[in-house]
Amino acid sequence: MFDNQKFNSEIKLSILVKSKLHFNTIIIIPSDNQIDKWKNFSSIKDINFDYPIRSLEGLDKNIFQQCLIKVKAKHIDISINCLNSWGYKYNKIMAPRQPKSGLVDLSSKFVLVVGSKGLSKNNRLTIKSDQSTDLIYYAKKTGNSPFLFIGEVVNEKNWMYCIN
């Protein structure tokens, strides 16, 4: 559906949900305010009610779908709750390479929490950095279109983005 088209218009999440568009690969960079709000919900189901990513999932359950959430490591628990609320199964955490040996505190470092659904894909690819362009490159290599980036403005062919 999105082949040979360039999507770079800013759309609010509520409008995107009403559009009935569906995505197989979603990258989310939540704001600190969103993280704080989700942390205080009494049920993880409330996350999807507040932020209805489940409404955007691809309809074909035979296609691999993934959701990548970039957060500080101290928010891994909330990210996994988000994946569960949105119907994704937690797969892995991708953390930056550490210059020190041994166990180090990553709580203030950005990590990528990855979840999936549908037919599984096993990959051993790494991500160059936590920059949006590198996240997009990784998602294109590991995921399926259509693609959605939530939380930042991106200007990438065949990607739609959503702010707010």
What is the meaning of each model-derived region?
Residues 1-164:
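Class I S-adenosyl-L-methionine-dependent methyltransferase catalytic core
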